[in-house]
């Protein structure tokens, strides 16, 4: 099976690095799926989107991301996000409360996290 190297990095931490069969991300141009040997491109992530990684070995990984870039070469995908959180790390009750916050950053992070949770529960 063909593989592509993937790195998902936020301002705060490296979330994941490894080999995957496909990566999907929501960009300002639409949702994109990246397979090995994809044509090089640079994309801007949407404000509150979802990144999905299918590792070669293991379960599908789903992260909520907010702002940033997606860099694709034939061998590697690098996702640099201002904020990223795994769906299974999201405290749903706290995130839902943050949706009503006056703090725009907290609201954006909550929206990204909840989108990841929804995507995860849909099994997509």
Curated annotation (Swiss-Prot):
Question: Which keywords are on file for this protein?
Answer: ATP synthesis, Cell membrane, CF(1), Hydrogen ion transport, Ion transport, Membrane, Transport
Q: Which residues form a coiled coil?
A: none
GO MF, any single term? proton-transporting ATP synthase activity, rotational mechanism
Under Gene3D superfamilies, the record lists:
F0F1 ATP synthase delta/epsilon subunit, N-terminal
Task: Give the membrane topology, semicolon-separated if more than one.
Answer: Peripheral membrane protein
UniProt-annotated location(s): Cell membrane
Question: What do the Gene Ontology cellular component annotations say?
Answer: plasma membrane; proton-transporting ATP synthase complex
This chain's function reads: Produces ATP from ADP in the presence of a proton gradient across the membrane.
Family assignment from sequence similarity: Belongs to the ATPase epsilon chain family.
Q: Subunit arrangement? A: F-type ATPases have 2 components, CF(1) - the catalytic core - and CF(0) - the membrane proton channel. CF(1) has five subunits: alpha(3), beta(3), gamma(1), delta(1), epsilon(1). CF(0) has three main subunits: a, b and c.
Question: PANTHER family annotated for this entry?
Answer: ATP SYNTHASE DELTA/EPSILON CHAIN, ATP SYNTHASE EPSILON CHAIN, CHLOROPLASTIC
Protein name per its UniProtKB record: ATP synthase epsilon chain
Q: Which organism is it from?
A: Corynebacterium glutamicum (strain ATCC 13032 / DSM 20300 / JCM 1318 / BCRC 11384 / CCUG 27702 / LMG 3730 / NBRC 12168 / NCIMB 10025 / NRRL B-2784 / 534)
Lineage summary: Bacteria, Bacillati, Actinomycetota, Actinomycetes, Mycobacteriales
């Amino acid at each position: 099976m063909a593989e592509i190297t993937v790195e998902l990095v936020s301002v705060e931490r490296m979330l994941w690095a490894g080999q995957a069969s496909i990566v999907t991300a929501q960009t300002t141009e639409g949702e994109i799926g990246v397979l090995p040997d994809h044509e090089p491109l640079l994309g801007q992530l949407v404000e509150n989107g979802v990144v999905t990684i299918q590792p070669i070995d293991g379960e599908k990984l789903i992260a909520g991301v907010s702002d940033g870039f997606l860099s694709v070469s034939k061998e590697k995908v690098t996702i640099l996000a201002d904020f990223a959180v795994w769906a299974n790390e999201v405290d749903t009750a706290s995130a839902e409360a943050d949706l009503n916050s006056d703090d725009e950053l907290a609201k954006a992070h909550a929206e990204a996290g909840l989108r990841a949770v929804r995507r995860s529960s849909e099994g997509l």
